[in-house]
Regions:
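N-terminal capping/lid subdomain adjacent to the active-site entrance of alpha/beta enzymes
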Residues: 1-119
């Protein structure tokens, strides 16, 4: 059975990051992990206040789908379960990563894309 874990992580920046609307000295990331005892799929997101997201609200959205993830929620089902945003991004990435590891197939291959190559 799959389980879902998620947490808020704070990373200090090496130096102050400044753009026209402000400065910040740290970045806040919400991580999601889907585990089954053998495989772990990981995803992350950066909540954006512009879209009324806080780290806590995004974490709550992710955690609310714990029972659905345990029941086998697919990437397609996720699209209907959450609106576009940071939480859906983190879980979508975690599901892609989980499926890739479980099937021992790279994500690019699952998506029907060409193998990545240097630019």
């Amino acid at each position: 059975m799959r389980t879902l874990s998620a947490e808020i992580e704070i990373y200090p920046l090496h130096r102050l990051f400044t753009i026209s609307r402000g400065s910040k000295s740290e970045t806040i990331v919400v991580t999601a992990a889907i585990l089954d005892g053998s495989h772990t799929g990981r995803g992350e997101c950066g909540p954006n206040a512009r879209y009324d997201e806080t780290p806590e609200s995004v974490l709550a959205q992710i955690e609310s789908l714990g029972p659905d993830i345990a029941a086998g929620m697919s990437r397609a089902q996720l699209q209907d379960a959450l609106p576009p945003g940071a939480a859906r991004n983190a879980l979508d990435c975690a599901l892609w990563d989980y499926d890739a590891k479980q099937m021992n197939t790279p994500v690019w291959e699952q998506a029907g894309l060409s193998a990545p190559a240097p630019l």
